[in-house]
Amino acid sequence: MIKNGTCPYWERDDLSECARREYIEFKFPLFILLTGMIYAFCKVFRAFYLRGKNHTNEAPEFEEQGNGNHEYARFSVLRLKSAWESRSFCNVNNRSTFDKFKKFIEGAFIVLQLTIHLYILSSMPMDNKKFFHQGFLVQMFLWILLLVVITLRLISASQSFRWVLACKRDLWAVSFYSYASLFTLSILPLRSVFIGKIKDKIMVKYIISETFIDLALLLLLSTSSIEGTRYSFLVENENKKLPPAPTVFGLLTFSRIDRLIWKAYKHCLGNADIWDLDINNKSIAILANFEMSSKKGRLLPNIICYFKAVFISQLFLAFVSSFLNFVPSLLMPRILSYVNDPKSKSWNLVSLYVSSMLVSKIIATTCRGQGLFLGEKGTMQLRTVLISNIYSKTLRRTILKDSTTSLQKNASTSFEENPDSSEAEPRKKSSRKDNSVNNVMSIDAFKVSEAMNTFYLACEAVFMTVTALMILYSLLGWSAFAGTFALLAMIPLNFWCATFYGNYQADQLILTDKRTSGISEALNSIRVIKLLAWENLFYQKIINVRDGEIRLLKKKATIFFLNHLIWFFGPTLVSAITFSVFIKFQNQTLTPTIAFTALSLFAILRTPMDQIASTVSLLIQSFISLERIQDYLNESETRKYEILEQSNTKFGFEDASMEWEAAETSFKLKNISIDFKLNSLNAIIGPTGSGKSSLLLGLLGELNLLSGKIYVPTVESRDDLEIGKDGMTNSMAYCSQTPWLISGTIKDNVVFGEIFNKQKFDDVMKSCCLDKDIKAMTAGIRTDVGDGGFSLSGGQQQRIALARAIYSSSRYLILDDCLSAVDPETALYIYEECLCGPMMKGRTCIITSHNISLVTKRADWLVILDRGEVKSQGKPSDLIKSNEFLRESINNDSKNTTHNQIDLKRSTTSKKTKNGDPEGGNSQDEVCAEVENFEETKMEGSVKFSAYKWLADYFGGLGVVFVFTSSSILIHGITLSQGFWLRYWLDTGSSGSKSTWLYRIVEGHSNIYFLLTYIIIGLVSSFLTSGKVWIAIISGTNVTKKIFAKLLSSILYAKLRFHNVTPTGRIMNRFSKDMDIIDQQLIPNFEGLSYSVVVCLWIILLIGYVTPQFLLFAIPLCALYYTVCTLYLRASRELKRIDNINISPIHQLFAEAIKGVTTIRALADERRFITQSLVAIDRSNAPFFYLNMATEWITYRVDIIGTLVLFSSSVMIIMKAS
């Protein structure tokens, strides 16, 4: 009996009447009344006071000052958010009509409760039962408060009470809090009624009616959409599918995804079937919030600051879940005591213990699911933050002169594992190779984001360890500290393993960078590789780097084996030491009740030990990847927004000296002073290597300005510019010497974000000599150009890049030798009709060229460069008279092109050349046919058996897999024998003897014999289990080596047609993220699956052996488990496939941004490309988000089924005992 003064809390097997009246009926309802009333009053008063005032959550405006803000305007997500919202369709997921009708039912139930209380209160005899009267009065006032609350919720739709909307969610929270609290309080009185402790008929009817009305109200609110929350969705079109409005029940049990899972069960899912993300999970909202909460500095503190609310929530949920997970262990000694002696406790009390086990496990499972889902949602958000920051950095990063190496250099040195340190070190310090940036995004960003899942597991592990040790101390006394010290002694071993694992991981990532960089270079140069038959050379170089990766993977497998061995053998060692101290030094009797309760705690301890080991390992990998991301984000950025000065009258240089950032050569542009003529054609000539391209890049602000000034018409973002009356904007367009095209159609590449005007488009196509080519293509302007223009000839690529600059609304054009890849006749036509034609009216054009006679023919201003210096400049006619070298160069060019003079009519041009390419270029029949735009597809339905057999064949066949699985059954049988041995030891009664413990003889054996055998069984089991894992990983590593070699060979030796229609980003996704999954997740996950299946089968067999009646429950539970798993497998399979497909466009965007960053920045089009990346990220996040929700959906249900197994087996055991 538990007492509190004169009022006992508990009487034998039930709550006392005094406690029920004082606490259940009075004090707790009074607390609910006061807290609910104060909270509701404050929220309603605030809403009423602030009525009519406009409060928004808009981001604070920033002051524009200094040149640095031009960069902020281009890259700030806060600036981008408003533009995004204005262009997107905002849909609100409103409450259904049935949900609104439920509120009237809710009000009717509240009125019914008030009526019942008034009736009982009026008919109650006035006596000295103070708490009885007070309790009814308090509860009546509480129901009056809830009636007021439901009334306010009902009238919130009225225009006269619109201010109530501001606190509608708070009012709903008060109702839910009250219903849930009252129903919880009514459970114990209802139990008292069922076991016959309450005899009064009126009270019995009252308690039953109150409980079921409270339950009805709670169910009404739990299954209705949450009020006061607008779930808005920013989508590209109004037909995008939206998820159902969330309910409390749906959020807690993840039932919100039921419809999607059922749809996936009936037919295959596509991108159109995936629900959109609500606005709070959109990348634009995530980044805007992150930007507002972040400060300049390292990434880690900003991440912690942004996710602090998530961390605090996970900390609380982990605490609750960890404590409740031990409730079955705390109740187990009492249940076992009843099993040993049914007369020691009443059936009612033991049934309460079993029910408490069920309830505690359900609540613990719910808390754990919510904590893990918070981590998974945080993973998605952190991944969004990292990928977006890396992409934004790519658009801001300084370009390097040596960023693009020659193919010969790549073939000879790119894959060397130990390059000369004298050459490698400066490069390492200056910048990461462009081709390895994709690796930072695809591997490092994902590894860092996965660390969000580990925080909850780490907190849970710490809480579970502390709680288990506390319970062990209460059970075993100070001998539990002996086990604790043994546990602490293992921590240095874990950290030692983690340190080595981290070092190997860092080395592996370096080799992965080299591998992906080499593959990217090979894909970008695949035409030349096939032309020179270098496939075998590149294959061997990449395989050599891959072999280094495989060696490191095997070293990591060895460390994993040691860590696994510590994890498995730890509980055995700890339990052996604890039991030894308990028996020998404390001189206590080790009974089966104590032993198996302690063993259950040690078994629970194994989970946090595993979590700590895996968490440390994952955190080390994450910190290594985070450092790599931080190093990339710390790389030097372009200073163009600082060095360029805006001027409406000047366009050029004033005594400017410039150099390349981190250049390997000492080349500089020295003392450049040029004032380009506005609304004119300006030409720059000079010998090869004189600095013409560097000069144009300097004008764009891409070089490092050492001294002087650079004047440009604008430094503002493209979206912020105003269109003039002539349709032009005061901006620049750039056409590089090497044409840069995006994967898309010809129209996409030419229009490039501008408003499409068919007449203007046709004029540009004609002036750039593209109209004949387009007519020859089946799809016309909708023809896909392939990855980076791969399907087009060099001349076509350059003319499309030129057409993009001409079609743009920019008033200033910067063209870098844009006619070098076309034949002389086409070059002359483009020069006359395009660069000197009506398309250039009112525009300023700066062009560099080696064709001196062509560009000087009609140029208004000529600049001659030599060795980085301006030798002369002026009108071409004046320079020709005064410069003999220029005069001779023009005469030589004129002699060479005399026989190519043509009539400027288009008919003659098309007869002499194909595609406008120089003689010997790719023919139109070869490269200009319509290129189909193949979208990445996915398999449908279940994974075919042939796929499993294909993987099994790499292992050595299905026989090897069968032997491996069978060994798991045998090994776990050995593990279970340890428990049987302990039971046999205890049944011998050896611990009850008074003789010397170590040499006590029972049935011819001493206690040391039993103890050593117990330890040996645990050690053998641990070695076999860990060895099986090690063999599996080593074998899997050899398998991944073969798979990679097969994949690489297929790609390198594929026909050009395949490369024409397959974007590089899609291929890189296979070699980066997919290969990383195969390397590090496939085999461990398979081994974990086989282990779990074996353990599950053994548990069912053992429970069935001990309690055969359990099999009656096992059959429906197994059927339920099969149904749940079948539903999940189909949904998860489809979602994983879609998720994997939707990542490829992100890879493609990165590849395009790396190649075309100069063009993008010149066009001031960074904001549009960032928007495209955010759309791609959202497209990838949607299936990832719902895949995680589906994972928690099945995890929750499987845990509930496991809880039902525990509950049903416990019921069978106590029924058998009674």
From Swiss-Prot:
It comes from the Eukaryota. It is a multi-pass membrane protein. GO terms for cellular component: fungal-type vacuole membrane. Its main location: membrane. Residues 410-434, 892-926 are annotated as: Disordered. Residues 892-901 have a biased composition (Polar residues). SUPFAM superfamilies: ABC transporter transmembrane region (SSF90123), P-loop containing nucleoside triphosphate hydrolases (SSF52540). It is found in: Membrane. Signal peptide: none annotated. Pfam families: ABC_membrane, ABC_tran. The chain crosses the membrane at residues 30-50, 104-124, 131-151, 170-190, 202-222, 303-323, 352-374, 450-470, 482-504, 559-579, 585-605, 954-974, 1014-1034, 1083-1105, 1110-1132, 1198-1218. Residues 51-103, 152-169, 223-302, 375-449, 505-558, 606-953, 1035-1082, 1133-1197 are cytoplasmic. Residues 311-621, 961-1218 form the ABC transmembrane type-1 domain. Keywords: ATP-binding, Glycoprotein, Membrane, Nucleotide-binding, Repeat, Transmembrane, Transmembrane helix, Transport. Glycans are attached at residue 4. GO terms for molecular function: ABC-type transporter activity; ATP binding; ATP hydrolysis activity; ATPase-coupled transmembrane transporter activity. Residues 424-434 have a biased composition (Basic and acidic residues). Residues 651-892 form the ABC transporter domain. GO terms for biological process: macroautophagy; transmembrane transport. Belongs to the ABC transporter superfamily. ABCC family. Conjugate transporter (TC 3.A.1.208) subfamily. This is ABC transporter NFT1. It comes from Saccharomyces cerevisiae (strain ATCC 204508 / S288c) (Baker's yeast). The gene is NFT1.
